Amino acid sequence: MHSSAAMPLPSPSSASPHLFVNPPRLYDPRANGYSHVVVAEAPARLVYVAGQGGEDRDGALPDAFDAQVAQAMSNLRMAVEASGAGLGDVVKLTVLVVDHSQARLAVVSGALRAAWGDGLAPACTLIPVPRLALDGMLVEIDATAVVPLADGARA
């Protein structure tokens, strides 16, 4: 499309109140599993999820990048759901990748598409880094979610 107007996209679930926008004059990011813009309306509860790495509950960290990404996404889902939110409430991700490459981008993009589908996903920034907190840690993903408040609910 060559229109200059922003193109709102349907939300990932019928319950999501967020507006996902991929302006047609920008690169279409959906193949990489993210959206350019997510608009969330107040009143809402904000949820900030700390960076989730590829370690399991016992602290074991696999060597393979794809295994770490899969575990990090599983950890992220568990953390988001523990707050009472769901993946459809996530509006922003930051992904840190050690030794970033096109091959690693493909793994991350595939994991994001698997979690959010081919249509809509949160806004996302991927940052290549030289090192993360733990020896052998290759990926870390943090999230911000916005959960609309029911009428009369408190933040």
Over which residues does each language-model region extend?
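N-terminal presequence-like segments and the immediate start of the first folded domain
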Residues: 1-74, 78-91, 98-155
